[in-house]
Amino acid sequence: MVEPASPDSDEGISLLEFHGNGDRSWQLNFDDFQVSPEHKEKKSPSKLHNCLGCLGPEDNVADYYQQQVEMLEGFTEMDELAERGFVPGMSKEEQDNLAKSETLAIRISNIANMLLFAAKVYASVTSGSLAIIASTLDSLLDLLSGFILWFTAFSMQTPNPYQYPIGKKRMQPLGILVFASVMATLGLQIILESLRTMLSSHKEFNLTKEQESWVVGIMLSVTLVKLLLVLYCRSFTNEIVKAYAQDHFFDVITNIIGLIAVILANYIDYWIDPVGAIILALYTIRTWSMTVLENVNSLVGKSARPEYLQKLTYLCWNHHKAIRHIDTVRAYTFGSHYFVEVDIVLPADMPLQVAHDIGESLQEKLELLEEIERAFVHLDYEYTHKPEHARSHC
């Protein structure tokens, strides 16, 4: 039986205090289950093989051992967290510097979008190309989306614990959802306009040498700048900056397609221009529809992968030897991070102070994980009861 903590002990309880240096035979230990170097060297099947259904016996074996390696690495990570009491990572100063860098990336992207939009407006007026106009309208939406993403980032940095007690991190996927919806709507409008042009009686498309030079020069310059912004923004892990990177990459594709459509329409036939615009529109709808689905899943509370739940269960069981059972381990998305619910069973005669300290330290330990925004640890003395929440499975 666990003895209650002495009254004169410190109020702040270390995450390491419960482990001590005594007997650890009660803990799960996978140190003896190491994958041989022979199997570590086996490469998992490529995505192409997986998609085509061309997995042979060797591919399945390699995939199995890859999963085992990842599982053992995950358990090792949990052991390091339990032993050190913290997750190795950036210091407060490094985090502040990273936040400043992310803000700078957003500002650079917004300024570049304004300048490039002005250049593409001139190219659209000069060429009259539907494909270039479609690309220019996309740049206009870049400015609008930039404002949306900036607003969500600003909202997240101004907490209000009374009106928003669990924070505003849901603003991030909501902003991306609005952005994606506007982009998909633009794509549909471009398709309708392109079809109208193809069915109209006006069937000519001609550019002078001077007009062609201006259009090609502007579009190539814009594409190069956007490509540099893609590489810059992809170096960050922040979801908003990554959304900018995706948008810049999309611009690179649309600029190239628009430029090719203009040149071919000028030298071959007029219909290539509206066809190029339709291709851009379909690409827009597909890209941002996938973005919508991804962010919807993050808001509706999709469960974490079984492999991640394994890691959490392992961490919970090894937290304290007084834990008799683990009743529930849940992790589900609530924005870009996980909410975690854990039910552990402790001895019925354990003093409240000791039980509280065990549960609180487990909660703090779980919240040290980068993917977890908030953890809830529920303490119980038995596990045969019905669910506490009347609508827990609705």
Swiss-Prot record:
Cell compartment(s), UniProt: Prevacuolar compartment membrane; Golgi apparatus membrane
Q: Which domain of life is it from?
A: Eukaryota
InterPro entries given in the database record: Cation_efflux (IPR002524), Cation_efflux_CTD (IPR027470), Cation_efflux_CTD_sf (IPR036837), Cation_efflux_TMD_sf (IPR027469), CDF_Transporter (IPR050291)
> Can you quote a single GO CC term?
Golgi apparatus
In terms of Pfam families, this protein maps to: Cation_efflux, ZT_dimer
Query: What UniProt keywords apply to this chain's record, in alphabetical order?
Result: Golgi apparatus, Ion transport, Membrane, Transmembrane, Transmembrane helix, Transport
What is the reported tissue distribution?
A: Widely expressed.
Please cite one Gene Ontology biological process associated with this protein.
Answer: response to manganese ion
Q: What protein name applies here?
A: Metal tolerance protein 11
Q: Which organism is it from?
A: Arabidopsis thaliana
